[in-house]
C-alpha cells in the first residue's frame, strides 16, 4: 500500500463492480478510507469491501440510490458518521442503452437520465456544501461522446450533460479550492461493456484504439486516483479521455 491518499475519505458511487470496483480498490490501496456504494448489489458491494479489508485497507459498503435526494443524503451521512468528513467524490454509477433514437421509449430516456445525470447532479449538489475544502471530484463520462456511433444517441446525451455540468461546476467550486474533473473511458473490459457483444464485436472495438486493446478497469482507476491526488492539483475543469488513443 502507498500513502498517496492517507487521511482522505472517498465516496465512489456504483462501486460494487467494474470500473467503480477498481477505483474503490485503487484508492484503498493508496490509504484512502472508501465508501463502496451500491443500489441493489449488496453481496457484490460486501465482497468488494471484504477484499479491501483483506489487503489492509479501510472501507465500508453503503446502500444508496443516488437517483434520489434521500439516497444521496444517506450516502454522505453514513460516510461522515462512520469514516469522517468527505474529501473525494467519484461519480461512477451509470447505465447504458444501445438503441436507435427513434426506438427509445420515454421511460427508457427518463431512466437513463435519472442514473447518469440526476445521480451526478444530486451528489455534486451535496458535495458543494459538504466536501472538505481542497477536496476533489471526478465524474465519469465516456469517450463515445466524440464517436457519433449509431444507437448511442441517448447514452451520449447523458454523458454530454455530465461533461458540461462538470466544467461549469469546476468554476463554481474554485472559491473552496475543490477541483472538478471528468474521466472519459474508451471501450473497457467490464460486464457492462460486454453485455450483448460477441467476441467479434469486442475485437473490432479493441482495434479502434491506437494501442489495439480494450482498456481494463485498473487502467481507468489509476487515472481517477491521480486526478484526485495533490499531484494533479493544477488540473481542474478538464475531461481526461483514457482510451488508448481511440480519439
Positions of predicted regions on the chain:
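Active-site loop-to-helix junction immediately N-terminal to the catalytic Tyr of the SDR YXXXK motif
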Residues: 104, 144, 148-156, 168
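Conserved glycine-rich cofactor-binding loop
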Residues: 9, 16-17
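Alpha-helical segment proximal to the catalytic Tyr-Lys
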Residues: 129-130, 171-175, 233
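Substrate-binding pocket helix/loop in short-chain dehydrogenase/reductase
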Residues: 100-101, 105-113, 193, 201, ...
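Conserved glycine-rich Rossmann-like NAD(P)H-binding loop of the short-chain dehydrogenase/reductase
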Residues: 30-47
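C-terminal helical subdomain
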Residues: 182, 203-235, 242-244
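Active-site helix of classical SDR
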Residues: 124, 158, 166
